[in-house]
């Protein structure tokens, strides 16, 4: 079953290899290219606000580890996925499920190479083993889970894939860290009381707040996070946010002033053209009325 997944994504891995080899060096900052094009006259003038925004992006990129850009992060993610796919082909997922999750063979099934379709994980082992996984092991499971498509028949999905996906969605993992998974009702179960049975024709009303569970404060860790959210941002984040708002306001005011000055210049030039055209029109109107003076010997003709 695993070999079928890998065969379907063979073309995708080739495209990832092409993307990785397409660019090995980071391109110059966009703001520098825009200034260079403007100086050479190869492009139109860029608005000051756009230059400020791109400059801020270049400044923030210098504080990232090793100066990585978004393109570098995408290439790194592609490389990690390719490594995980290679590990899946080598059978590391089956070894992980057998040794760390305590997976067992399903009766009346046959083992087919590195496939995991003949395995089943005991429910209690999932909760214990998932918290002891390393980063590489979690990446391996995430890549394996992403190989399935929504159009796939539910019967063709391996049982271990169903178990892992159920735990990732509803187990004590990620946002549900600290929620009870086995043995009792989870703490974030919305309805705290059992609804009564209604007769035909009776009206169904909305439950009051005391009959539902507040999922924001159902466990101590969530309650602490909720109280921290209500207090607001920390001073450092607040300063950065206000600084960004101030820069945006300054850039907007500069653009508005520049646009208003250009409009005023156009109006003044139009007014000047109108003033210069009016005397010329007056001279053209009065020119046919005035007569040229005659010489003394031409008076006898009149």
Swiss-Prot record:
UniProt-annotated stretches for the region Disordered: 20-44, 264-290
Statement: the UniProt record of this protein carries the keyword Transmembrane: yes
Transmembrane segments: 236-253
Membrane topology annotation: Single-pass membrane protein
One GO cellular component term: mitochondrial membrane
Bias (Polar residues) ranges: 277-290
Chief subcellular location: mitochondrion
Compartments where located: Mitochondrion membrane
Transit peptide, residue positions per record: 1-21
Keywords annotated in UniProt: Membrane, Mitochondrion, Transit peptide, Transmembrane, Transmembrane helix
Domain of life: Eukaryota
Function: Involved in respiratory growth and required for cell survival in the absence of prohibitins.
Family assignment from sequence similarity: Belongs to the GEP7 family.
Stated name of the protein: Genetic interactor of prohibitin 7, mitochondrial
């Amino acid at each position: 079953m695993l070999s079928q997944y890998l065969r379907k994504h063979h073309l995708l891995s080739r495209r990832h290899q092409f993307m990785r080899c397409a660019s090995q060096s980071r391109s110059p900052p966009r703001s520098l290219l825009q200034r260079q094009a403007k100086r050479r006259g190869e492009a139109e003038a860029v608005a000051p606000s756009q230059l400020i925004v791109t400059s801020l992006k270049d400044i923030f990129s210098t504080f990232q580890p090793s100066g990585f850009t978004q393109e570098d992060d995408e290439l790194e993610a592609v490389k990690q996925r390719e490594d995980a796919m290679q590990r899946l082909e080598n059978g590391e997922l089956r070894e992980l499920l057998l040794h760390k999750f305590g997976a067992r063979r399903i009766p009346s099934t046959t083992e087919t190479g590195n496939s995991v379709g003949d395995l089943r994980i005991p429910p209690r082992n999932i909760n214990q083993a998932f918290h002891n996984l390393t980063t590489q092991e979690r990446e391996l499971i995430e890549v394996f889970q992403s190989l399935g498509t929504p159009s796939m028949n539910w019967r063709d999905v391996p049982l271990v894939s169903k178990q892992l996906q159920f735990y990732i969605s509803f187990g004590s993992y990620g946002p549900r860290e600290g929620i009870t998974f086995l043995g009792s009702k989870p703490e974030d179960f919305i309805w705290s009381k059992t609804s009564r049975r209604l007769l035909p024709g009776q009206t169904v009303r909305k439950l009051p707040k005391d009959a539902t569970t507040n999922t924001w404060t159902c466990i101590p860790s969530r309650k602490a996070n909720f109280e921290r959210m209500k207090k607001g941002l920390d001073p450092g984040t607040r300063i950065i946010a206000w600084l960004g708002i101030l820069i945006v306001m300054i850039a907007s005011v500069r653009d508005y002033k520049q646009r208003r000055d250009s409009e005023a210049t156009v109006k003044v030039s139009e007014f000047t053209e109108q003033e210069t055209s009016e005397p010329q029109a007056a001279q053209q109107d009065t020119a046919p009325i005035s007569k040229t003076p005659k010489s003394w010997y031409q008076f006898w003709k009149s």
